[in-house]
Amino acid sequence: MSVTDTHRTIDAVWRIESARLIAGLARMLRDVGLAEELAQDALVIALEQWPQTGVPDNPGAWLMTTAKRRAIDRRRRNKLLERKHVQLMHELEHERESAESAAEMALDDPFGDDLLRLIFTACHPLLSMEARVALTLRLLGGLTTDEIARAFLVPEPTIAQRIVRAKRSLAKSAVAYEVPRGDEIVERLDSVLGAIYLVFNEGYSATAGDDWMRPGLCEDALRLGRVLAGLMPRASEVHGLVGLMEIQASRARARIDARGEPILLLDQDRALWDRLLIGRGLAALEQARKLGGERGSYALQAAIAACHARASTAAETDWTRIAALYAVLARVVPSPVVELNRA
């Protein structure tokens, strides 16, 4: 494998593994900023070593073990938290006895809980929505500050500052690295879903720049939504959001004409709609319905989008059902935009 191919592989591995790597480290260290820094250190070492040694059989486990060693080195240098240092030393010794199996357990066993903690921490309500979005894409999406800046068409230093300030705010406020419980989870989940949907919308209908759409952001939001749905299978509104994004994303190829101008929904060539994404969206919507309870705004919007997706032509659209769904949506989230669409 050439150096270029190895670097491409490392980039792909990072996109896949970075979120749970950071999440696992944050669980141990209780410091999201330090966890990301150590994960980045492990990435740098991989970039230095893998072109010579080859990509390991379990690259995620290799990165986790390397990051843990960096954590031990750092604690040894700083002579802080000696008890935690000893704990990490014992853990590393155990991994050396059975590196592959222990590293896999570190990644796979607590993966769900760790990732949920990271999601809820990155989207904490004390952060501005802009900060939540930047931190989420950085920690969970595996994007660099440059990639985030280019996606939102803002200077890279601006994104970097948002991320730095967000991590400082979390540390200063001593935000607990945990999944919220009880009634708090409803409000906190709204914050998470809002951040993911904002990323999707910025890709679906860009608010800046010359391009009407930025598909990369839509893909990042969909990936995050699908992961969250897998981690919270009993949360109907998570499935509602995933259904909404899947169905909306299915129209991407039909939304722009040859000149780059938007095409209204009723004028789109429905043969260009992605039936696979529509199928996924309808399945997510059905899962939300099966879970029962009062439908939230995302599930309602997904149900409206499904009415359009099921119609072979604009003339076959079930406008009666759409009107009824908008009436319910207006009660759940009253807003001028909803009333305008309802009219």
Predicted regions located by residue number:
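A short, charge-rich alpha-helical start-of-domain segment used by transcription regulators
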Residues: 2-23, 33-36, 186-194, 198
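Amphipathic, Lys/Arg- and hydrophobic-enriched alpha-helical face
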Residues: 13-32, 45-49, 120-124, 205-208, ...
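Residues within the DNA-recognition helix of helix-turn-helix
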Residues: 17, 59, 162
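C-terminal flanking helix
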Residues: 22, 29, 43, 167-174
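Short, small-hydrophobic-rich alpha-helical interface motif
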Residues: 25, 35-46, 63-66, 166, ...
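DNA major-groove recognition helix of helix-turn-helix
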Residues: 39, 50, 75, 152, ...
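Σ70-family region 2.3-2.4 aromatic/basic alpha-helix that recognizes the −10 promoter
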Residues: 43-44, 57-86
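Amphipathic helix-loop-helix modules that constitute alpha-helical solenoid scaffolds
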Residues: 83-130, 138-147, 154-327
